[in-house]
Amino acid sequence: MCEIIGRKKEIAELKRCYESGRAEFVAVYGRRRVGKTFLIDEVFHDDMVFHHTGLSPYDRRRKVTLKDQLQNFYFSLLRHGMEDIAQPKSWMEAFFLLERFLETCDNGSRQVVFIDELPWMDTARSGFLTALEAFWNGWGNMRHQLLLVVCGSATSWMLDNLINNKGGLYGRLTGEIKLSPFTLKECEEFYQSRGIRMSRYNIMQAYMIMGGIPFYMNFFNPSYSLAQNIDALFFSRNAKLGDEFERLFNSVFDHAEDCMKIIRFLGTRHSGFTRKEIAERTGLNPNGDFTKMLKALMGSDFVVKYTPFGFSQREEHYKLIDSFCWFWLHFKEKKAVKQNDYWQQHLKESDVASWRGIAFEEVCLQHISQIKYALQIGAVSSQESSLIVKGSEEADGMQIDLRIERADDAVNVCEMKFYKAPYVVTKGYAQVLDSRLQALEEKNPAKTFLLTYVGNSDLVSNEYSDIFKASVTLDDLFV
C-alpha cells in the first residue's frame, strides 16, 4: 500500500471490517472525484478477489442499457478467472454467477469483493436492487470470509437504497463511510508528496478553486505557478478540466440538466434562495422530482439547506457550497474563454477580488473545527450559521458571515477577510462593527457577543483593532 494522505479514520474502519472474522457489507460514498476508488484499491489491493466498476451513464451517443451493464459485469467475472459460460440475462443470474465464482476460489481466507459506482448499474426497470438484496440476504451474509465493499458517487442513490433502505436491505450494512474532500492541511501534505512547492497562501487559493478534491490536484504541474496550473486545467485549449462541470453532473444525477439549472441559479447569490424562489426563477415544477433533485444536490454536498437567523422555517434557504462550481460558474462558464493565459492576465481584476471574498468564506465554513480549535472552544458544543437580519424603517439590516453560538452562552460573530497584506481596521469599519454588536446585544441580552476576525493575513494592531476579541489566521486553518 502506497502512502495515503489523511483518511486515517476511514482506513481504520476498513481494517476493522477486514479483521472482524464475519461477513461484512460496507458502503463508501461521497462526491465524485473525492478519492473513494483510490482508497479501497490501496487498502485492499492484495486481498481483492473481484473488482467491478459500473458503466458510466455519461455517453453522448446513447443511453447505457441493462444489456451493457450485464455484459460489463460478465466480462469482469471472466477477467478474474471465472470459467467461460453463458452470459447472464438478468441481475439475478449475474449475482448467482458471482456466488459460484467466489465459491470456486474460496481458500478459507478473507475474500474482498469491490463493486465500484454501484448506482450506475441500477438502470431503469433492471431489477438490480432486488438481485443485490437476494445476493446478500440469501448467500453473502452467511459467508464469514466475505467482505463486500460497494462505492457510489450518486450519493442520493446510496442514501435512499442502501443506507436508509426500508426494504430487504434495511439494517444490512455493517459499515458506512462518507469520504469528504481533503482539509487544507491534507492538501498541503498532498502537494508536498508530489514535489509541488506552494505557499499556504496559494494552497488556500487552490482550495478556493477546487475544494480539496484530490483528482483535480493530481493534475498540477510542479514546474508551474498556481496561476499557470489553473490556466492549464481550465482555460487553455484542450484543458484537462475543460468539460468537467457537465461531466460531473451527467455522471451523478438522473435529471442532470435540471440539476445544473438549479446550481447555475444558486450561483447568482451567495446567501442562497428559498425553494419557491428556485422553482420560480428556474421554471422548474416544484413537484416530487424537484424535491428529489434538491435532496440529491444536498446529499452530494453541492448544496446546503439552512434557515438564516431571524427567518421562519418556511424561509429555509438553499445555498451553493461547492468551491469548484463557484469558480466554474463565475469564470469558466461566464467568461466563455479559451485563452491559454486567461487566469494569469486577470488576477488583479475586481471580479476576481469579489469572488475571492466569497470563496474564502466557503473554505472557512468547511473548516469550522479548525476555527473552534484556534479559539480554544473545540470541546464546547455549538451551532454554526450565517446571520441575516432584515432591515426595517427603524433599523438597517445586516449580514454576518459566520455565527458560532456556544453552549456557554457566548456567540462568536466572525468577520471573514481575504487580503494579501495584513488587515487594517479603520475607524469607519470599527463604528459599523460596534453598531452591529449593539443591535445584537439589544435583541439577545442574555448572550455575550465576541467579534472574531477570520482572515488569511494577520490583523494589524492599532487603536481600532481591539474591536475584535479574537482572531483566526491562515496558519490556524491548516491544523
Located regions from the model:
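Phosphate-binding site recognition
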Residues: 1-346, 350
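A cross-kingdom feature that marks ATP-driven nucleic-acid transaction machinery
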Residues: 309, 316-479
